[in-house]
């Protein structure tokens, strides 16, 4: 018992180190925090017996609570969250204009300042955050209009609730599929998930909660549960667009029942997006997505290999203008092939989804660390590990 206590204290110390003291540019300090964190995480997973499972799940929740009041030093996305939230609260649609528009035309709402504008990491593109996130931004900045840090705490509160829900749902789904209960620790104690979701305010955590909730209700044969599942799936898509890639697998499994399911998702998404829809929305949102596939390059895998080969052979430097979209098409058709090839069963669905998101991550031009939170969550129901 005392060993558990010591390890839990070390977990807490490493969480505090990564959440409160390390800055984004301090690479060695980040590695110094993550390396022992992951080693202990693996040790706990391998050694944990059933009797200690609830203790470690509680530790996972506690570590997230520790990060509730930290400022997200490892990510500067919070400034765009706050920017969008204030725009909504002052009657502006965040999808209408680039941030520079408000500076150039001197129409900044009172709480938005040139100083905040200079902190944005995304001045050159329109916002890409779907309506569920925009609502959270608006509520958080409405509660604390004068404080970025306090608005961040409010956003983290939503994520914390989602993470607690995800841990519970993972436990229920593992029990339902008669899988090892300690697999829940693969998500609950994962250092990357803890630090990037609750610590650095990345809403993959909320997307995962809604996706797990949709899956939990979907495996029921009750029509009411299927309605709830469709609404939860809409919430997941309206948090991050990524779960759209999972829908074709449901068509194969549900067959004619998918018509009603997809209709509910479509209506729910229309209602969620309705407050933001206007003549500019599709053009501006599409422009940002196009920019993502054509211009952004970070931690890519297949893209970097093909780019290097192209540059060696053709000695031209505009490869990213077409290679990114080309890989997106490759990913699309690979996922469709996966839908056709994989057997349709609720038990096999998480593995199919895991393969699909793995194909996406292999082909995309940008892979931030927090993108791995989704495959980590899905892998707990499979024999594969991230």
Feature map (PLM): residue ranges:
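Start-transfer (signal-anchor) and selected internal transmembrane alpha helices
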Residues: 1-67, 71, 175, 345-351
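Transmembrane-helix motifs of polytopic, lipid-linked glycan transferases
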Residues: 39-46, 139, 153-177, 333-341
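Hydrophobic alpha-helical membrane-interfacial segments at the cytosolic entry of transmembrane helices
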Residues: 56-63, 255-277
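Aromatic/glycine/proline-enriched transmembrane-helix motif characteristic
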Residues: 167, 295-366
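Membrane-interface alpha helices of multi-pass inner-membrane proteins
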Residues: 194-197, 213-217, 225-251, 355-362
């Amino acid at each position: 018992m005392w060993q558990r206590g010591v390890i839990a204290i070390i977990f807490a110390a490493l969480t505090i180190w990564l959440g409160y003291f390390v800055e984004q540019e301090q690479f060695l300090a980040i590695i110094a925090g993550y390396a022992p964190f992951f080693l202990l995480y693996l040790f706990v997973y391998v050694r944990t017996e059933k009797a200690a499972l609830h203790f470690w799940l509680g530790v996972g929740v506690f570590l997230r609570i520790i990060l509730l009041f930290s400022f997200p030093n490892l990510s500067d996305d919070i400034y765009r969250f706050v920017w969008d939230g204030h725009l909504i609260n002052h009657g502006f649609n965040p999808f209408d204009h680039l941030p520079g528009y408000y500076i150039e035309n001197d129409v900044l709402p009172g709480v938005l300042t040139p100083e905040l504008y200079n902190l944005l990491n995304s001045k050159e593109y329109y916002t890409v955050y779907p309506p569920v996130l925009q609502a959270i931004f608006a509520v958080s900045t409405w509660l604390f209009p004068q404080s970025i840090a306090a608005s961040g705490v409010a956003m983290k509160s939503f994520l914390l609730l989602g993470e607690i829900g995800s841990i519970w749902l993972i436990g229920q789904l593992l029990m339902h599929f008669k899988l090892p209960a300690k697999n829940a620790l693969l998500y609950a104690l994962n250092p990357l998930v803890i630090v990037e979701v609750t610590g650095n305010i990345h809403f993959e955590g909320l997307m995962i909660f809604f996706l797990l909730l949709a899956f939990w209700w979907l495996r029921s044969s009750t029509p009411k549960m299927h309605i709830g599942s469709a609404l939860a799936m809409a919430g997941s898509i309206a948090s991050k667009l990524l779960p759209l890639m999972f829908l074709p697998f449901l068509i194969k499994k549900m067959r004619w029942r998918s018509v009603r399911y997809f209709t509910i998702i479509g209506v729910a998404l229309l209602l969620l997006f309705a407050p933001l829809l206007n003549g500019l929305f599709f053009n501006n949102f599409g422009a940002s997505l196009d920019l993502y596939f054509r211009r952004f390059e970070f931690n890519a895998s297949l893209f970097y290999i093909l780019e290097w080969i192209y540059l060696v052979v053709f000695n031209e430097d505009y490869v990213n203008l077409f290679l990114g979209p080309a890989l997106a098409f490759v990913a699309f058709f690979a996922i469709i092939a996966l839908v056709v090839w994989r057997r349709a069963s609720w038990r096999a669905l998480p593995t199919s989804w895991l393969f699909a998101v793995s194909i996406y991550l292999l082909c995309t031009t940008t892979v931030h660390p927090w993108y791995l939170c989704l495959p980590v969550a899905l892998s707990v129901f499979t024999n594969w590990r991230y």
